[in-house]
Amino acid sequence: GTLWPLKSPEQRDCAFLRACDDCCRLAGAPQEQFVSGIERDLEAQFRYDKNPMMTWEQLRGLTRRGHIVGSHTMTHPNMAYVPDAELRTEFVESKRRLEEALKSRVDHFSYPCPALSPHWGDRTVDASAQADYRTAVTTNGGPVRRHHNPLCLRRVRPTKDVDGLRWNLECTFMGRAV
């Protein structure tokens, strides 16, 4: 491995960005090993919530109340860098597990928000179609038009206040990405 100097804020920023880039190119067990290695080498002690995820019963409650639950991968990788065999597993297995637990069809997929771009492409769009998704939302900002491919939809980011909403609307109507 590479030894990175960590004495200055700039050196730490550079090492962090490089680690993010390297981590985003991995998926599954190799990604987990990479992160575990960093935790070990830095003697980091990260705080984890005891219950950071929703339970199956909470998800079923949402669907009973009319919410749509979509898939988001098994291991949260950058899908553009996942090998073909693992790509299929990320799409299919996350969908299958949700459908089995919720006893309902899962038609929608949301790409993980990566630290490295791109995070989707023609290969991932094809794989999402083969996994039988009807829509997939990317992390690319901007409005969605009728003619856009439903398997690589843009999104308008939520805002905390009216000024943020106003900015999103102005960008949308001026044709800029949000």
List PLM regions with ranges.
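C-terminal active-site subregion of NodB/CE4 polysaccharide deacetylases
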Residues: G1-L6, R64, P77, Y81-V178
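Extended, charge-rich helix/loop segments that form flexible
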Residues: G1-R65
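Histidine-centered catalytic micro-motifs
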Residues: I68-P77
